[in-house]
UniProtKB/Swiss-Prot annotation:
The active site is at residues 11, 130. IGPS catalyzes the conversion of PRFAR and glutamine to IGP, AICAR and glutamate. The HisF subunit catalyzes the cyclization activity that produces IGP and AICAR from PRFAR using the ammonia provided by the HisH subunit. PANTHER family: IMIDAZOLE GLYCEROL PHOSPHATE SYNTHASE HISHF, IMIDAZOLE GLYCEROL PHOSPHATE SYNTHASE SUBUNIT HISF/H IGP SYNTHASE SUBUNIT HISF/H. It is an enzyme of class 4 (lyase). This is Imidazole glycerol phosphate synthase subunit HisF. Pathway: Amino-acid biosynthesis; L-histidine biosynthesis; L-histidine from 5-phospho-alpha-D-ribose 1-diphosphate: step 5/9. Its EC number is 4.3.2.10. InterPro entries: Aldolase_TIM, His_biosynth, HisF, IGPS_HisA/HisF, RibuloseP-bd_barrel.
Amino acid sequence: MLTKRIIPCLDIKEGRVVKGTNFVELKDAGDPVELSKIYNEQGADELVFLDITASFEKRGIIIDVVKRTAEQVFIPLTVGGGIKTVDDFRKILRAGADKISINTSAVKTPKLIKEASEIFGTQCVVVAMDVKRNYITNPRDENLKDKNVFETKHGSCWFEVYIYGGREGTGIDAIEWAKKVEILGAGEILLTSMDADGTKDGYDLVLTRAISEKVKLPIIASGGCGNAKHVVDAFKDGKADAALMASILHYRECTVNDLKKEVEKNNIPVRF
């Protein structure tokens, strides 16, 4: 079994780290460079910066934040938000990022995945998916013909891809989209459950497992981490390759090292 990764996520708005619940009610959580240094010292395997307003508003000062972080932190850094072109990839990589995450632009312009992977390498291209459960009220609905339906304790649902920071549904089935981005050349999928986001009730294991079983790409589980057991569950039951978390680290409820110790106790390989 490959070593599992623990990845702190920093949602950045106007140069500050913020955290919300279900993609809303954002609260300030600190300075991105300072938090990055703390997580680096705690043993984080990677960091993810998501400029959460950039796809919807104009790009802010994320390049400056990336530069300042890359000067002081020496673990892989993934940056996403407002990346629309190959030139945007180039600018963020030059600022010090190791990987680029695309979400809205991948859905709007799928060929960007292919172009970027051919120029910069597949390892550089992370496709982020914001996904929400779409519960079925009418099983005979014609629109369900091309959807992957799952039974959950709350009822039957399919998983819908959202764009623009979770503001707009696309009607695209998440399983089918994951398979498509793999073919186009993505190197990794950052999979966020909008239903679980910020709740601290655990990752959406049905979603995570469904995507993990359908593609060969590494899957980063995101949304809902509230304790170390949730991370273990994401690896064991969700079959994720990495776990992303924010709130529990930002508000110092635990450290990266605490999480890794619990994962190791469950005979899951991690790097210290």
